[in-house]
Amino acid sequence: MLKHMQPKYIQMVRICRLLGSVALFALAAYATPPVSCSQGARQYFPCELTFEMQPDELKSPQSAVNDDLLRVEFRGPSHTTYMMRGFWDGGRTLRIRFTPTEAGEWAYRITSASKRLNEQEAKFTASETAEAGMVNVANLRHWRSTNKKPHLWLGAEAPWLDLDQPAFETWLDARKKNGFTHIRGTILSGHGNNKPFAADGQPDLAYFQALDKRILAVADRSFTADLIIADQAFVESGAFKDREKMEPLLRYVVARYGGLNVTWQGIEHFDDMAGSRGLLRDMGLFLKQLDGFRHPRSSDARASSSPLMGDGWMNYIVEASPRPEVAAVEHQFTEMPSVHVVSTAEPAGFRHELWNATTNGQYLSVPYEALRNDANAKAVETWYKLVSDARHWEYEPFFDVSGARAVAVDGRKDPNAEVDFVECLTYAQSPGIVEVTLPRHKYNPYWVNPSTGEEIPLKDIRTEVISRQTPDNISDWVLYLPREGRKESMARSYYFESITPPVQEPEVDVAKTPFDVVDPPGEQLSLQTPVPFKIKLTKNNRATRAMQYVWWGEVISSGEGLRLLAIGPAGFLSVPKALASPGGILTLRLEAINANGKAYEIDRVYTLTP
């Protein structure tokens, strides 16, 4: 059996280069690491193995970062294996960080450049806990945990290093009370004087040990950490300018944090930067190789990360447009879970984004500034109370409604049987009459005030058409229509997924499309001035009474992929700088859905002119 030394952190003399706030990082340098895997490991909580290398085994810090010196393969009670890489933590110390996904006996085997350590084997026992485990994609557009139970993704953005540790932990506890399940933040920041890596690629341990303290506090409270790998400033510093520079930095980040319950979110606002698609493709494919747990992968975006889907590395979408049409249309063209990043802190706008995203079938991530307003925290608690009690993992947009947006759950086991709705959630952003058409069953409806959480029960309903005036003419309202008995029955006997989620092929036949592109006219688009765009309906009927349009553009020769150009039936659009190549050929793609959710796609080709 291999004997391990007790974990100990080594003081770094480079603090003077790093610190803008000395006290914060000095405290973090002494952060207590997770328990030793050999002494006190717990299911779904991180533990560590610590190795002290000999002088001839670790010749320089650069070698510790650039060379793959240590790997450990863990094998659980059910014989599932995970490969974890070691990370340098100062001096001659290497650590392996790991989260046991099962209770019981684990075995591990070491692969190392050190002959002294290579092929050593040992065992440890992880005690059972009641936690849910790591998050992964399920039911096509939804989530579940390692314990195979539905997972409700509700994220809050964290300023990792802007708060001292006590204040940060107090903030975390408040988020737990609100109902949040994820904490979101950036790993590699290029802002300020506190840089994660020196020019030679050596990690600044004070930076990472401070970050450890925050992220481990997140793990201790059973949150999932949503990790934006790098902000724009870090990317623009040139640290990722080529694969040779990027790989050791990414390897270090994954070794340090990939053993925790995390998701990966690429780079900040990728769609603002030229060259970001190629960078993310390299990062994403490298993540697939490095990440032993195969955590969910996507990228942060100003609009949406959906244009990156075709590159084969991501498995969920991050969408951040304040306009609900983007995600509404996107849902009908994609087959991945989508997380909406709320863009405003103003209470009314905040609620609108919260509930519009929900009725688009999305999950949520909330900015730090928004939660500094108690009204928004209350709105989140109201949202969580209602949605956590619903079958949210089967929500799909529902269109047989007027005066509101809606999602519903179809409880059929057999897709060829008659529709059997279990519940319907509608959101009226503006007061007025909400009308919903549902199969004839007994529903137990009630109104919910999304600002206060006030619930107003209504009489049970058996009619097919349900029409109700909102309780006041001032604010937004949620009308929830569950069949409580049916929900209870399904909870006892149904599998995680009761029916295969719907997927449709967009209509591309112009003859069957109820609209046409009037503008931009001609075959050229100017790069100097905004260009008008306009849709003309060619068929006016009930299905076209509420069309939603999203305009994308791509210059194939640029390699940048699609970029969002405009939203709506008319207005002006500009070509983003990443696509602005005079003489380039731009493919203008219009994606749309009608009032019934039917999807349409039209492509036009233009030459870009100076």
Question: What does each model-found stretch correspond to?
Answer:
Residues 554-575:
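Surface-exposed, flexible coil segments in extracellular/virion-facing regions
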Residues 541-550:
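Solvent-exposed loop segments of extracellular immunoglobulin-like
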Residues 115, 593-598:
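Short, solvent-exposed loop/turn segments at the edges of extracellular beta-sandwich modules
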Residues 39-44, 62-64, 523-530:
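Short, solvent-exposed loop/linker segments at the N-terminal edge
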Residues 294, 309-375:
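Catalytic-core region of carbohydrate-active enzymes that cleave or remodel glycosidic bonds
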Residues 33-43, 56-60, 346-459, 467-505:
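Aromatic- and carboxylate-lined catalytic core of secreted/periplasmic carbohydrate-active enzymes
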Residues 82-140:
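Extended acidic/polar, glycine-enriched regions
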Residues 67-69, 129-324:
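Active-site mouth of glycoside hydrolases
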